[in-house]
């Protein structure tokens, strides 16, 4: 959520920045609502003061032995008017808040202006795509050759965009997640967390999934005996529970940064993706991801973004997977991000790079929703923290990249050296 004072005092400047990312802010509507809010605020305060004054007069009149009934009736009437004014003010403030919750974050000044993914800017490349002297098989064909990917079984169990992994392919999937967690915890300074896969509405509001992206989530039906408390949704990413661990907290600045990681399944409806990536593991309703989250001082967040992106890059480098790093343009950034780097890994069968990690600085956008603050020992004032999140990495897509980049002419899949300790020294699948 943006700073309400910024929306009130600099609406035109905010509108200009939002226009860079293709969002039209209705400045006139917000201005009219704000003027109405000011009028109601003054009215409420005046009624409150008048009622307090009249209430005090009742006691004074009673002490003088005067008839207090007219004053009592007047106080009651003022109370009714005050209640009505408060209700109108509350409704208006709720309307303003509802609008504010749909406004995306402001892009950082250095983010390239653009409309969509075609306007993203490549920053760097690492590694050289392998040249094959045989016909490249995609991961689906390789998985079926080794009886490791069973999409038909998943359709029987659930439906499309799910998979059953088996044997050494399932083992490699697990090995990848363990490797990523060990790297982030042992070398990059993250603490490992196990988090719920179901979260409540407040948590989803905190990180910005609600109200705007309710349709992207899988929601549970409340239990009858807990109808008011069990309106949960499956997490679309571990960013949601990890970041909300600091919701409502005031953190000592000496304890920052807080760096957390978790390996979880992620659940997404993929609304609007009909017909896209229907073959294989690239776009699933359920997929695993190792997530990185950092909670930092405001002045440290841009440096933290560079660091976090480097942590994701290290996974790809140790796996020997060619990739490119791009900075997303204003029109392609996520709702809460002010700056985002994507890492795209080389997928031989598609002869292109595909997203495997997205690392974002969310500035104070989530912190304001969550009321997550920090305070230094020398200053009693609190300030909002900055939050960052990044994939380190998407496990299923990493599996795709390993299978395709490490395939052999006979269909075997070489196991990258860094994964062999997690697979009992296995050198090849097949």
Swiss-Prot record:
Involved pathway(s): Aminoacyl-tRNA biosynthesis; selenocysteinyl-tRNA(Sec) biosynthesis; L-seryl-tRNA(Sec) from L-serine and tRNA(Sec): step 1/1
Domain of life: Bacteria
Organism expressing this protein natively: Escherichia fergusonii (strain ATCC 35469 / DSM 13698 / CCUG 18766 / IAM 14443 / JCM 21226 / LMG 7866 / NBRC 102419 / NCTC 12128 / CDC 0568-73)
GO molecular function: ATP binding; serine-tRNA ligase activity
UniProt function note: Catalyzes the attachment of serine to tRNA(Ser). Is also able to aminoacylate tRNA(Sec) with serine, to form the misacylated tRNA L-seryl-tRNA(Sec), which will be further converted into selenocysteinyl-tRNA(Sec).
Protein name in UniProt: Serine--tRNA ligase
Domain observations: Consists of two distinct domains, a catalytic core and a N-terminal extension that is involved in tRNA binding.
SUPFAM superfamilies: Class II aaRS and biotin synthetases, tRNA-binding arm
Reactions accelerated catalytically: tRNA(Ser) + L-serine + ATP = L-seryl-tRNA(Ser) + AMP + diphosphate + H(+); tRNA(Sec) + L-serine + ATP = L-seryl-tRNA(Sec) + AMP + diphosphate + H(+)
Statement: the UniProt record of this protein carries the keyword Ligase: yes
Range of residues in the leader sequence: none
Protein family (similarity comment): Belongs to the class-II aminoacyl-tRNA synthetase family. Type-1 seryl-tRNA synthetase subfamily.
Keyword vocabulary terms for this entry: Aminoacyl-tRNA synthetase, ATP-binding, Cytoplasm, Ligase, Nucleotide-binding, Protein biosynthesis
InterPro entries (alphabetical): aa-tRNA-synt_IIb, aa-tRNA-synth_II, aa-tRNA-synth_II/BPL/LPL, Ser-tRNA-ligase_type_1, Ser-tRNA-synth_1_N, SerRS_1_N_sf, SerRS_core, tRNA-bd_arm
Subunit: Homodimer. The tRNA molecule binds across the dimer.
């Amino acid at each position: 959520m943006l700073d309400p004072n910024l929306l009130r005092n600099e609406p035109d400047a905010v509108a200009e920045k939002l226009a860079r990312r293709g969002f039209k802010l209705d400045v006139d509507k917000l201005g009219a609502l704000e003027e109405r809010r000011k009028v109601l605020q003054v009215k409420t305060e005046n009624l409150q003061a008048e009622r307090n004054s009249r209430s005090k007069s009742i006691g004074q009149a009673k002490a003088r032995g005067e008839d207090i009934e007219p004053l009592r009736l007047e106080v009651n009437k003022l109370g009714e008017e005050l209640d009505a004014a408060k209700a109108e003010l509350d409704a208006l403030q709720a309307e303003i808040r509802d609008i504010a919750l749909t406004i995306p974050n402001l892009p950082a000044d250095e983010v390239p202006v653009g409309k969509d993914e075609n306007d993203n800017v490549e920053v760097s490349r690492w590694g050289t795509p392998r040249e094959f002297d045989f016909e490249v098989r995609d991961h689906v064909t390789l998985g079926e050759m080794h009886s490791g990917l069973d999409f038909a079984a998943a359709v029987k169990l659930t439906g499309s965009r799910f998979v059953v992994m088996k044997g050494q392919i399932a083992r490699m999937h697990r090995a990848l997640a363990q490797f990523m967690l060990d790297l982030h915890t042992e070398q990059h300074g993250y603490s490992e967390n196990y988090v719920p896969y179901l979260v409540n509405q407040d948590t989803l509001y905190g990180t910005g999934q609600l109200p705007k992206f309710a349709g992207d989530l899988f929601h549970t039906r409340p239990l009858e005996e807990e109808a008011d408390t069990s309106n949960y949704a499956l997490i679309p990413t571990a960013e949601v529970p990890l970041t909300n661990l600091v919701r409502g907290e005031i953190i000592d600045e000496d304890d920052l940064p807080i760096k957390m990681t978790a390996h979880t399944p992620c659940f997404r409806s993929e609304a609007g993706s009909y017909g896209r990536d229907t073959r294989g593991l690239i776009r699933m309703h359920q997929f695993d991801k190792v997530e990185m989250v950092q909670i930092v001082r405001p002045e440290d967040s841009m440096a933290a973004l560079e660091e976090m992106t480097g942590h994701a890059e290290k996974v790809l480098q140790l796996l020997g997977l060619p990739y490119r790093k791009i900075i997303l343009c204003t029109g392609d950034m996520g709702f809460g991000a002010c700056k985002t780097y994507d890492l795209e890994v080389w997928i031989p069968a598609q002869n292109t790079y595909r997203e495997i990690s997205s690392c974002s600085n969310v500035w104070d956008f989530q912190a304001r929703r969550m009321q997550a603050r920090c305070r230094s020992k020398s200053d009693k004032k609190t300030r909002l923290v900055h939050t960052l999140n990044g994939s380190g990495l998407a496990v299923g897509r990493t599996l795709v990249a390993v299978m395709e980049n490490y395939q052999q002419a006979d269909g075997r899949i070489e196991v990258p050296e860094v994964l062999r300790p997690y697979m009992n020294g296995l050198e090849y699948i097949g």
